[in-house]
C-alpha cells in the first residue's frame, strides 16, 4: 500500500471532557478504575484517549491511591 492510500485513524473522544471532569482526585476511585486494567496497570494514553497533561495527572493520582491502599498495585496475580 502506498502512503497516500493509508487511512487516518479516527481520533478517540476524550472521556474526561465528555464527562466534564476538570479535577482528577486520587480519592475518586470510580474514575481512576476506568484508567487501569483488570491487572491493575495504568492504561496507555492511546487506549484511553486522554491528553498528555491529563495522563500525567491520572498516573500521579493512581500512584497516590495505591499508596493509601485505595487501588491495588499491578501484580502477576496468583493462582
Swiss-Prot record:
It comes from the Bacteria. GO terms for biological process: translation. The keyword Ribosomal protein applies. The keyword Flavoprotein does not apply. Transmembrane segments: none annotated. GO terms for molecular function: small ribosomal subunit rRNA binding; structural constituent of ribosome. SUPFAM superfamilies: Ribosomal protein S18. Keywords: Ribonucleoprotein, Ribosomal protein, RNA-binding, rRNA-binding. GO terms for cellular component: cytosolic small ribosomal subunit. PANTHER family: 30S RIBOSOMAL PROTEIN S18, SMALL RIBOSOMAL SUBUNIT PROTEIN BS18M. Part of the 30S ribosomal subunit. Forms a tight heterodimer with protein bS6. NCBIfam families: S18. Belongs to the bacterial ribosomal protein bS18 family. This is Small ribosomal subunit protein bS18. It comes from Micrococcus luteus (strain ATCC 4698 / DSM 20030 / JCM 1464 / CCM 169 / CCUG 5858 / IAM 1056 / NBRC 3333 / NCIMB 9278 / NCTC 2665 / VKM Ac-2230). The lineage of its organism: Bacteria, Bacillati, Actinomycetota, Actinomycetes, Micrococcales.
